[in-house]
Amino acid sequence: MKKTLYEKIYDAHIVHEEKNNISILYIDLHLLHEVTSPQAFDSLRMRNRSVRQPKKTFATMDHNVSTESKDINASGSMAKIQMQQLIKNCEEFNIALYDLNNPKQGIVHVIGPEQGLTLPGSTIVCGDSHTSTHGAFGALSFGIGTSEVEHVLVTQTLKQQRFKNMKIKIVGKVKKFITAKDIILFIIGKLGTSSGSGYVIEFCGDVIKKMNMEERMTICNMAIEMGAKSALIAPDETTYLYLKNKRYSPKNKYWDSAIRYWKTLVTDENALFDKEFTFDISDISPQVTWGTSPDQVLSINEKIPDFNSFKDSIKKDLARSACNYMDLKPGSYLKNIKIDKVFIGSCTNSRIEDLRSAATILKNKKISKNIKAIVVPGSGSVKNQAEKEGLDKIFIDAGFEWRLPGCSMCLGMNNDKLSDGERCASTSNRNFEGRQGRGGRTHLVSPIMAAAAIYGHFVDVRNLNSETN
């Protein structure tokens, strides 16, 4: 029987098969952070249970941490309690922890791949919705709830239904200044935020093959915004090169054995998908979200849509509501929208390639006096590499604040927030109402588009000099 990549990984991890396409799957890697794990550990103690596979469980502090200080008190009392609890839990149950004093500490979906924990063909779970990021390596990865966190800690397994298969093939020639973020936002805009519900999406095509691993992670990270359970990209030479000699990657003869297995992790020819889409991205422009959902997105040179242009009454109402919240008028140009803050970071776009691309735009430029801009590396390793390359100096000279690793302004769960009515050009993944702070208005963009917004409004990065002179 011909199988898709998803079916191969799913079938290889079945511990017990039940009725109605539901199975108990073995979990190869369990990632933890300070927000969704405390209750799970409390339940373990109440029931006198232990962690079955501590060596397959790794934790970090990222959601609540201060990006201005390594002091555990810096993010407030609740954050301090959660971080102290994570330290206690990891010590008691013998789990490796990347705490504030660990030079490798960072966002869970950044440090997993860079440490070689994320491996092709593995199953990976975390109490965080953007766990799909790891699918860029050909790993079946998805977010889970706190009760499931407890179940995996105790059994190293999880009951999962078999999801449907979707293939998204991306073809065409990628033009200069068009990034992986633009491509995935464009696709979400075309298909919608519920298009992936009930599916695992496999991304493929020449465009994907030419992407580096950081770009692939951006694609898979944002697939969850289509409603998908997970996303996958088949591993290839680019994957192997990225993983070679990482701390936890297989070594010596085990590396050779791993490569042989990883090369089997491709969808069989003529395997059946439940849905298939092909997108030619040759002519797309830089993308900017205008509303309060990732699918409310336009090319930079377009206007905010007229409500009456939506034939669907629900979409019309959503557009009206979004414009009210975002304080935008139909017919106004995206390029005329004034920005209060710029945020470069998050598990979507805080890796070294993201910072390099943004720094290229910012070199010898200064931010407007009317805006505040911060750049938050995704991990200590990313921060150190950026500083070795002098990227921090470029950001600082441009007027950015160079911060410590963490989730930062992606979510209003730490000190980095928008105030009521503030508008942000953000490289994060969600633009929901209040996502970056109560009353905050979020526009999702690529790192280079965020960098180009330093003049206090959106700019077509392709025409940066001509539009800002």
Swiss-Prot record:
Pathway: Amino-acid biosynthesis; L-leucine biosynthesis; L-leucine from 3-methyl-2-oxobutanoate: step 2/4. Keywords: 4Fe-4S, Amino-acid biosynthesis, Branched-chain amino acid biosynthesis, Iron, Iron-sulfur, Leucine biosynthesis, Lyase, Metal-binding, Plasmid. Binds 1 [4Fe-4S] cluster per subunit. It comes from the Bacteria. Its EC number is 4.2.1.33. Coiled coil: none annotated. GO terms for biological process: L-leucine biosynthetic process. It catalyses: (2R,3S)-3-isopropylmalate = (2S)-2-isopropylmalate. [4Fe-4S] cluster binds at C347, C407, C410. It holds the Pfam family Aconitase. One of its GO terms (molecular function) is metal ion binding. Gene3D superfamilies: Aconitase, domain 3. It is an enzyme of class 4 (lyase). Its cofactor is [4Fe-4S] cluster. NCBIfam families: leuC, PRK05478.1, PRK12466.1. Catalyzes the isomerization between 2-isopropylmalate and 3-isopropylmalate, via the formation of 2-isopropylmaleate. Heterodimer of LeuC and LeuD. Belongs to the aconitase/IPM isomerase family. LeuC type 1 subfamily. This is 3-isopropylmalate dehydratase large subunit. The lineage of its organism: Bacteria, Pseudomonadati, Pseudomonadota, Gammaproteobacteria, Enterobacterales. The gene is leuC.
